[in-house]
Amino acid sequence: MARKTPIERYRNIGISAHIDAGKTTTTERILFYTGVNHKIGEVHDGAATMDWMEQEQERGITITSAATTAFWKGMGNNYPEHRINIIDTPGHVDFTIEVERSMRVLDGACMVYCAVGGVQPQSETVWRQANKYKVPRLAFVNKMDRTGANFFKVYDQLKLRLKANPVPVVVPIGAEENFKGVVDLLKMKAIIWDEASQGTKFDYVDIPAELADTCQEWREKMVEAAAEASEDLMNKYLEEGDLPEADIVKALRDRTIACEIQPMLCGTAFKNKGVQRMLDAVIDFLPSPVDIPPVKGELESGEAAERQASDEEKFSSLAFKIMTDPFVGQLIFFRVYSGVVNSGDTLLNSTKGKKERLGRILQMHANQREEIKEVRAGDIAAAVGLKEATTGDTLCDPAHPIVLERMVFPEPVISQAVEPKTKADQEKMGLALNRLAQEDPSFRVQTDEESGQTIISGMGELHLEILVDRMKREFGVEATVGKPQVAYRETIRSTAKDVDGKFVKQSGGRGQYGHAVITLEPNEQGKGYEFFDEIKGGVIPREYIPAVDKGIQDTLKSGVLAGFPVVDVKVHLTFGSYHDVDSNENAFRMAGSMAFKEAMRRANPVVLEPMMAVEVETPEDYMGNVMGDLSGRRGIVQGMEDMVGGGKIVRAEVPLSEMFGYSTSLRSLTQGRATYTMEFKHYAEAPKNVADAIISAKSK
């Protein structure tokens, strides 16, 4: 089967934005204009084609990035047919993992901003991620019909907040309810869309007189930006005072792909204006798979290698998303970087070192699907029948193994206990949690050995809430979620010398007799428990000494203050006595345990709490609020530094118990413009008032 669309005409793009910037509506319009779905789905009534999980439709936010293929010949049929693969990315901070994951497989991105709200918090996070993966991008200012819409204000915010270099290629005609269309600065013509045909037809008309000066000014800025692409162009521009359209497009394209500039457009997806011109810009300015550097990887020998985006190259692809589909089971979304693969071929999962047969290949359109026989370099598709693959795995030709760069996923920051509501839910819950953890690498499941509870951990409170919700909807498991819990520990601060432990039972016949004397002292942090046998002259027979050690180890599981595990102590067994007839292992275990409990009471026991290393990235204006709040949470600020592209990073150590509800309060403190990460650092002694509260809570 030959290739339908030459790879130069592929555009793999992501559409990403802050919640409510109108991203889903924008994607919907793209699908409508590219002729894929003929009735437009509106988010307002929960019918958008891309948002296909039930919760998304209820919450009106996009959670999972669905991948869709569309075709475009240009607004006025002025291009050969291009193939656009769109990855829809979520705009909520608790789903940053999804955004990060889709950035990895994109060639370009279209950032959607609200003409009223401008650059919002998540936009900053997404922008940083796009910088990290060097993704070329366009900016689309949506909702130009809303009260308070201001295209030029958003232009200023892009420069100021994101340190971006936006280059408008259109300017709006009117704003708010008077928004009519846009002026195309390349053609210097106004574009007015026909409302009756939902924007599928349009006319080029003369620029309204009142906009002539504005358009001239912005055209000059655009041509200057193009001229900076090369010395030759700059000289041509200086000589002639202008540049031909073809030169401008090529120069802006080169600079966009080099991440030096971001072409900027505007419109209102809801009113069918501007998205069509933005699609043309995707073709004009965003890269095809051959315009960006070849994907890098590692061979079995550990050598670095590259794979060119070509059908002739050996097959390599990356699995970037797993979804459970109610009809076909598990779908693995993958991006083909090089080569060709057919359904039925055997692939090597080089990340895990396992071979698997590729079953069916599906081309996804939001939630409809078309079965295809092969995929080629540049394609994004979904595979059915791969059992082993998880997010971030490389799937490649077994004869030519390569591991593409691995994705790095953040550690979860919040944990909660989940309990099934009924016995019947018990087994299903284990299955459901494992399936969800497979789909989402930032979600972990473990069993707490101390309490026997199942503990789930994730990226934020909303993240866990949605996973528990999915468990109920997709797997029919009802579960109750506990309050987030903290794992405390106990240790000692001083030494207790020569403490006796004597276990004696004489009750006629054979009795029990064990006697051990120990010295207990603090150990270095992180060293755990150590036992030293210092018995001289056989006062305790050799065979009973391990029993004393075992008795102490049993007692370590539950300390004397509040029953938390005891850490970092040294025990010296120094003396004892025995009875020829009555002594046995059990008696010495009991003696060891009694001696340890008594010694611990005397050795100034304390409660330890987990301390977290917290990093907050915040705009400078909110710095004071953030620092004040961290100190209020018993945090110790350890340092600050400037962020590349504005803003500050605050590093602090904060007790885990004080961090519950933090993502919510940080959001309100900084109007959602700050993000934070936290990971476990070490255990530290809890202040007396805190320790007392913990002990009394535990004893209830």
Curated annotation (Swiss-Prot):
Gene3D superfamilies: 3.30.230.10, 3.30.70.240, Elongation Factor G (Translational Gtpase), domain 3, P-loop containing nucleotide triphosphate hydrolases, Translation factors
Domain tr-type G: 8-290
Functional note: Catalyzes the GTP-dependent ribosomal translocation step during translation elongation. During this step, the ribosome changes from the pre-translocational (PRE) to the post-translocational (POST) state as the newly formed A-site-bound peptidyl-tRNA and P-site-bound deacylated tRNA move to the P and E sites, respectively. Catalyzes the coordinated movement of the two tRNA molecules, the mRNA and conformational changes in the ribosome.
Family membership noted in the UniProt record: Belongs to the TRAFAC class translation factor GTPase superfamily. Classic translation factor GTPase family. EF-G/EF-2 subfamily.
Transmembrane segments: none
Subcellular location: Cytoplasm
A GO BP annotation: ribosome disassembly
The protein's name in its UniProt record: Elongation factor G 2
Major place of residence: cytoplasm
Residue positions binding GTP: 17-24, 88-92, 142-145
Keywords: Cytoplasm, Elongation factor, GTP-binding, Nucleotide-binding, Protein biosynthesis
InterPro entries xrefs: EFG_II (IPR041095), EFG_III (IPR009022), EFG_III/V (IPR035647), EFG_IV (IPR047872), EFG_V (IPR035649), EFG_V-like (IPR000640), EFTu-like_2 (IPR004161), G_TR_CS (IPR031157)
Species assigned in the record: Burkholderia mallei (strain ATCC 23344)
Pfam families the record matches: EFG_C, EFG_III, EFG_IV, GTP_EFTU, GTP_EFTU_D2
Cellular compartments per GO CC: cytoplasm
Molecular function per GO: GTP binding; GTPase activity; guanosine tetraphosphate binding; translation elongation factor activity
